[in-house]
Curated annotation (Swiss-Prot):
It is an enzyme of class 3 (hydrolase). One of its GO terms (cellular component) is plasma membrane. This is Elongation factor 4. GO terms for biological process: positive regulation of translation. Required for accurate and efficient protein synthesis under certain stress conditions. May act as a fidelity factor of the translation reaction, by catalyzing a one-codon backward translocation of tRNAs on improperly translocated ribosomes. Back-translocation proceeds from a post-translocation (POST) complex to a pre-translocation (PRE) complex, thus giving elongation factor G a second chance to translocate the tRNAs correctly. Binds to ribosomes in a GTP-dependent manner. Signal peptide: none annotated. Residues 2-183 form the tr-type G domain. It is found in: Cell inner membrane. It catalyses: GTP + H2O = GDP + phosphate + H(+). It is a peripheral membrane protein. GTP binds at residues 14-19, 130-133. Gene3D superfamilies: 3.30.70.240, Elongation factor 4, C-terminal domain, Elongation Factor G (Translational Gtpase), domain 3, P-loop containing nucleotide triphosphate hydrolases, Translation factors.
Amino acid sequence: MKNIRNFSIIAHIDHGKSTLADRIISECGAISDRLMSNQVMDTMDIEKERGITIKAQSVRLNYKFNNEEYVLNLIDTPGHVDFSYEVSRSLASCEGALLVVDASQGVEAQTIANVYIALENNLEIIPVINKIDLPSADIEKVKHEIEHIIGIDCSSAICVSAKTGVGIKELIETIITKIPAPKTNDEAPTKALIYDSWFDNYLGALALVRVYEGNIAKNEEVLIMSTDKRHIVQDLFYPHPLSPIKTKKLESGEVGVIVLGLKNVADVQVGDTITLTKNKAKEAIGGFEKAKAFVFAGLYPIETDKFEDLRDALDKLKLNDSSITYEPETSLALGFGFRVGFLGLLHMEVIKERLEREFNLDLIATAPTVTYEIYQTDGEILKIQNPSELPPVNKIDHIKEPYVKATIITPSEYLGNLITLLNRKRGMQVKMDYITPERVLLEYDIPLNEIVMDFYDKLKSLTKGYASFDYEPIEFRVGDLVKLDIKVAGENVDALSIIVPNEKALSKGRELVKAMKEIVPRQLFEVAIQASIGNKIIARENVKSMGKNVTAKCYGGDITRKRKLLEKQKEGKKRMKAIGKVHLPQEAFLSVLKID
């Protein structure tokens, strides 16, 4: 056991984490150069395309050092803010972490968040400066940033280039000498932490575990502690990107995959504890929670008969990603669909893209919303995710909305524009710190609702892509909020309702009806597009009717004849207006997203 090292890699997107993992794998000789594909650790196509790691992957490597065989378990973690829960459970399975920072870009916001998780878990952190082959690399500046922001001594930081392979050997030797071996206790009751789970078409739901105490052998009966369900261990193996290595037993301190023959990943929830039935652990491993959805959106199939296909697709995705929540909902405008909960915006994009790509569905997504707490006058508290569920104004005492702590690192030349954007988004400054004269760290408390629409895109375009951003939820706070409804031809369009701050309601309403006017097709009768709060109309635009020349068939003749025809047309239009239906195109639902 003293020769096992469990470690993970912490890095911001694009700082070269997956490439570094590939280099370490090939240096240990786990995969021959012929079979080595870029980003071995990333298994989903969408991960390779977007260059991000979504699911935590693992690999067991063997390395000979000072005439002793060592086992290195590399546990890959996602770098993106939405997947910080996956990061926390991956890091809890390790004794050490490599903090990878790009030599040309320096420390970024998401790196800080993940380092703090590692420090909370008392991991040994090894600073690694990557991409030293780049002409723009500034190693001393990056060392200063790591020491200033994170407070880790960088005098012995390891400089590598994952692309060319410089410094990789030295890095592996540092992992062996610096990261402690797992503390183990073979005699204690078995405790194993599930830090990832996925679905395999042949073997069912698989649990990737780190054994803390005791051991697990094939054919033993195990107990999953949160559900109290019992299962027989059908198979055990060590993780490997190409072909898993079978084993009869997982000892304490080891990382491995358990096959229990389950049909559903929800039965092996990430963060749960597995123990043996015959010698049960007294308590589960602490510090874990179920992944919570923060952002909600309605997903509707464009072809209404595809509703069941969408349900099947969501069921299948749920097998692999237990953090998605969904329930059926109906909309008068869009028909049948689902209200789906996501970990964050990137997660929402990835899921929508996977539904469209892997299951050939065409989907309409409504504007993303967050959870609101509604305190009613009768003392009842409601939690709603859909604006159309908001009770009437006279029944509401006050509304609370979720706030997040946003951390932003930006070049100082963009600071003014950025602060203007944050103030417009109702942000409150908590801290401002100059890391170097050229880079600033900002901390803001900001309502989650202001971030979910298009904040990230605006931040990137204001700072030419140089700023980085991360957020974590803090609490619910009272807000002066109202529901803005959109009426088209007198009918409420429920899918376009949004909850907005009272002071922005008027301008938002005006912008929305203006945007809608451009999109709604002209009808034979005039169509009014109105924005309302409760029963009060606050903005209105008219879509002019298409003219039809009813007097064309009169050749000369009496003016009263023409008047009679025009009066008749007026009557017809009035009747049509009363019963006419307007079909809204897909762009109308997207226009809500583009309003600032």
